[in-house]
């Protein structure tokens, strides 16, 4: 697997939170989702990868050879969007355009305004409206328009789907695919989310985080095939309890989550066994991690 980013032993320590040590690879040419609950360390990891904050320990390699993000044109090749936006609230869409035009040689102003129009933000009469007067969703749209208007090889987007309505999230998914297809295997997206349901159809590779640690990762199909969902009667669940990682019991039907290697044993016991989708997998794996740390 060709990797656009490789992190080894990455640690970032704060007073009340520690990220890592994290070892991960971001596959080149795909859309990777960094998934975890609020406070899992997703933003800290992305900020550390992008050089917004310096790591306490560890190393990140970019594009197969670069270990210093400040080296050469590395930052020109990476587009970054922060979860809460990255521009002063006193700025206008016009200011955002001018800043990117001055800061990045690969920024296309005409493309920026086209995307603003496509995203329903910063119309002709709103080009000088301050970000302070915009809704949270419109500020995110503006940031996305700016980052997609640049010539980049890697996009790092922190919670890009947050505060967006369903229609705009659908457009964002389309923009993801368009970006990757234009790159013909040379462009990559890394984005974080705490709710994968809305972005599952554009997720090729997933990394799950819990309490500052990576707990699972892989291409989505392979990842889902490592586990199974189980359903059956309460009496049956009493017999298979030791094979389950997580279980839910109610008055009649019970549900559980197990490793795929337990499939034959679970089916022999009379349960219904299915492969989870990504959303189901994330919920149960995060519950299992929480259970292990309680």
State where each predicted segment sits.
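Conserved ABC transporter NBD signature motif
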Residues: 58-69, 73-74
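ABC-family P-loop ATPase nucleotide-binding domains
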Residues: 82-142
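Catalytic Walker B motif of ABC-type/P-loop ATPase nucleotide-binding domains
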Residues: 155-159
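Helix-to-loop junction immediately C-terminal to a conserved catalytic motif
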Residues: 50
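Conserved beta-strand
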Residues: 7-10, 17-27, 58
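ABC transporter nucleotide-binding domain
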Residues: 171-190, 194-258
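C-terminal coupling/interaction segments
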Residues: 173, 244-246, 250-294
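The feature captures the beta-strand-to-loop junction immediately N-terminal to the Walker
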Residues: 35-37
């Amino acid at each position: 697997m060709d990797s656009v980013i490789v992190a080894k032993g990455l640690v970032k320590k704060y007073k009340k939170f520690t990220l890592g040590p994290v070892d991960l690879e971001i596959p080149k040419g795909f859309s990777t989702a960094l998934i975890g609950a609020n406070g899992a360390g997703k933003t800290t990891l992305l900020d550390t990868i992008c050089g917004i904050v310096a790591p306490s320990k560890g190393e990140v390699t970019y594009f197969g050879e670069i270990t210093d993000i400040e080296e050469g044109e590395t930052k020109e090749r990476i587009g970054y969007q922060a979860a809460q936006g990255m521009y002063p609230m006193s700025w206008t869409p016009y200011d955002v355009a001018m800043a990117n035009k001055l800061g990045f040689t690969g920024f296309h102003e005409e493309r920026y305004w086209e995307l603003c129009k496509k995203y329903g933000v910063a119309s002709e009469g709103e080009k000088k409206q301050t970000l302070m007067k915009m809704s949270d969703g419109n500020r995110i749209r503006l940031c996305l328009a700016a980052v997609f208007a640049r010539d980049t090889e890697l996009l790092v987007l922190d919670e890009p789907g947050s505060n967006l309505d369903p229609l705009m999230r659908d457009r964002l998914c389309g923009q993801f695919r368009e970006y990757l297809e234009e790159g013909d295997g040379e462009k990559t997206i890394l984005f974080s989310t705490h709710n994968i349901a809305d972005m599952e159809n554009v997720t090729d590779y997933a990394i799950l985080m819990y309490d500052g640690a990576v707990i699972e990762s892989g291409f989505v199909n392979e990842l889902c095939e490592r586990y199974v969902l189980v359903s059956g009667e309460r009496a049956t669940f009493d017999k298979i309890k030791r094979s389950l990682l997580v279980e839910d019991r109610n008055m009649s039907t019970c549900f559980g989550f197990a490793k795929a290697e337990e499939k034959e044993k679970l089916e022999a016991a009379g349960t219904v066994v299915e492969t989870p989708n990504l959303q189901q997998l994330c919920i149960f794996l995060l519950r299992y991690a929480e259970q292990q740390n309680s």
